[in-house]
Design a protein with these regions (language model features):
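Periplasmic c-type cytochrome electron-transfer domains
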Residues: 24-429
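N-terminal secretory signal peptides that target proteins for export/translocation
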Residues: 1-7
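Intrinsic low-complexity/disordered segments
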Residues: 8, 22-24
């Protein structure tokens, strides 16, 4: 697409104001606010949110048509994977080409826009990484000013997801859609572009990412309407089990060390994540279909190991030196909506690879990972009963905040009861 003068002018304006002061460069920012300067007004724009919703649910923006963002991020399951059969097994979802699979469980897209841009902080002698979207942080937010906006562009072009050959193909689909007038209108109203369908490809594709992020930022997605939210406002009462679970969550079980549960300094609702990276020792999921993907996608085959954050750090010159110290680490997800499901018996997987098939299972793992023997040391191994499989990655294991928490079965159940109060859609009586 040819760039005319008005578009070049608009691009400069968007770099300065709309995409934050860091949006024109692929470099890590020096300081990172919760939502980067100049981006919040876009995320709160109701017209951009409405456009983003149509993009999010459009199944015609894949090659072949048939896969929308919602295929892996569905509201009825807390904006993550809605296919119970897949959840029970590998927990990784197929792409538009149904024989192709990715390598990790879909993250929840709710509350993702509140993730800070990917950055490093120094704590004593340690460099700690914070923020970024995807399990490995590679959607940094350095491009469009918000990690969720960067993330929204990724699946469209991933051959194991929506499989479009390039951004122009995505834009062609947008421009022939029923909502193409809204795309043009938003571009004209916000950025002064006469026709977004004839604008610079990178710029127009940036609008797509920003619009999807705006929808994900809307009250329809980031609801803050759980029982716990009402409890914090004094409008709901926790049961005895839920109160006990909250006490354990913030105390003995150490959950709140990573899944922050208290309001922010200005009363902001808690996000239940510190956006940092840990290796909690999740076992390999033998049902992960990534192991059987062709060599063009997975050259390591059955020997593939999920290196997590390290894989991304190794690609960034200024951070590559920290890759080894972060092998096996994945970003702590929010635990908001962890129990949202269409029916009480519906199976939701947990962990970056979906190894755990219930909240009870992953809480028990955090409690007993270092207590039960390794699976290869027992006869008739039953994970979670008489053993746990070895971690997929044994190095950089977090041994200070989980593994031997000393919780009773009743205390584990209380923690699960509390986590169930984090589901949006609660109706106070």
């Amino acid at each position: 697409m040819k760039v005319d003068a008005p578009v070049r002018k608009a691009y400069w304006l968007v770099c300065v104001f709309a995409l934050s002061f860091f949006g024109c460069q692929q470099q890590p920012p020096q300081s990172v606010p919760p939502i980067a300067a100049g981006i919040e007004h876009l995320l709160n724009d109701s017209g951009l949110q409405a456009l983003g919703k149509k993009l999010f649910f459009d199944a015609d923006l894949s090659t072949p048509p048939g896969q929308s963002c919602a295929a892996c991020h569905s509201p009825e399951v807390g904006w993550t994977g809605p296919d119970e059969a897949l959840n029970k097994g590998g927990s990784v979802y197929p792409g538009a080409v149904h024989s192709r699979f990715g390598n990790r469980k879909p993250n929840a897209s709710a509350y993702a826009t509140l993730t800070p841009q990917f950055h490093a902080v120094r704590e004593g002698n340690e460099v700690v990484f914070v923020g970024g979207d995807f399990w490995d942080g590679r959607a940094t937010g350095w491009k469009l000013g918000n990690p969720a906006a960067d993330q929204a562009q990724g699946p469209f072009l991933n051959p194991v997801e929506q499989n479009n050959p390039d951004a122009e193909a995505v834009l062609a689909g947008v421009c022939r859609s029923s909502y193409a007038p809204e795309f043009r209108s938003a571009a004209k109203r916000i950025w002064g572009i006469d026709d977004a369908c004839k604008a610079d490809t990178d710029f127009a594709y940036g609008i797509v990412g920003l619009a999807i992020a705006a929808f994900e930022h809307s009250p329809a997605v980031n609801q803050f309407s759980s029982k716990y939210d009402f409890y914090l406002k004094g409008k709901a009462t926790l049961t005895a089990d839920e109160r006990r679970g909250l006490e354990l969550f913030e105390g003995k079980a150490k959950c709140a060390n990573c899944h922050t549960s208290r309001p922010g300094p200005n009363g902001e609702p808690p996000l239940f994540t510190d956006f940092r990276y840990d290796n909690v020792g999740v076992p390999r999921n033998p049902d992960n279909p990534w192991y059987t993907m062709p060599a063009e996608f997975n050259p390591d085959g059955e020997k593939w190991v999920d290196r997590g954050l390290a894989e991304f750090l190794a690609e960034i010159p200024q951070y590559a030196m920290f890759a080894q110290a972060n092998v096996g680490k994945h970003r702590a997800p929010t635990v908001r909506n962890v129990d949202v499901r269409p029916t009480p018996s519906f199976v939701k997987p947990f962990g970056h690879n979906g190894y755990f098939k219930s909240l009870e299972a992953i809480v028990h793992f955090y409690n007993t990972r270092d207590v039960l023997p390794a699976a290869d040391k027992v006869n008739d191994p039953k994970p979670g009963v008489n053993c746990w499989p070895a971690p997929e990655v044994a190095q950089n294991l977090n041994t200070t905040e989980l593994g031997n928490l000393g919780l009773t079965a009743e205390e584990e159940a209380a923690i699960v009861a509390f986590m169930k109060t984090l589901s949006d859609g609660y109706q106070p009586t």
